[in-house]
């Protein structure tokens, strides 16, 4: 709705981080071509899509690439969290939004309990987004009361990923972070029943 208004006012429009039209609505290309002065894309394959459609485009890279750096080694992170670096570590990344956490945390807890039954000595390391409150994490106590070894690190996702052997993560930015750390992952996503 805003694009036509800005275009009519002759205001140049630079669009940073392309809509995922390659996965959803390819028809949006016509709208973007009509109104956008330049697309700044973060994935290399997007550049060709826009160029082929005649949309001015520049590949600028993904903002996480330079940021995905752990501040501690696996051993340092495990020791700081009270875990044994010589035992398997599964990272749990439940997401950063309260609603996402409410929908996914029960599934992550159930998954962790299943993994623990199959993998002797496994430990769980949870990356917690700093803005999330304690009440939302209360269900994680189930893991500790079930005798599982678990620790939570606030705002240290890259350290958690560096320490992990495998990751169970919410779909989204964390999947890109996990890939940048070259960790195998299981991606979870749950939609509302209305969807």
Name each model feature, range by range.
Residues 137-155:
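Nucleotide-activated donor-binding/catalytic signature segment of Leloir-type glycosyltransferases, i.e.
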Residues 84-91, 122-123:
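Charged active-site motifs of nucleotide-sugar-dependent glycosyltransferases
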Residues 154-195:
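A donor-sugar binding/catalytic signature common to diverse glycosyltransferases
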Residues 1-78, 93-101, 121, 129-131, ...:
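Active-site and donor-binding regions of nucleotide-sugar-utilizing enzymes
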Residues 14, 40, 58, 125, ...:
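Hydrophobic/aromatic beta-strand patches that form the interior of the parallel beta-sheet core
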Residues 37, 88, 165:
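Conserved acidic residues
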Residues 97-127:
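Conserved catalytic-core segment of nucleotide-activated headgroup transferases in glycan assembly
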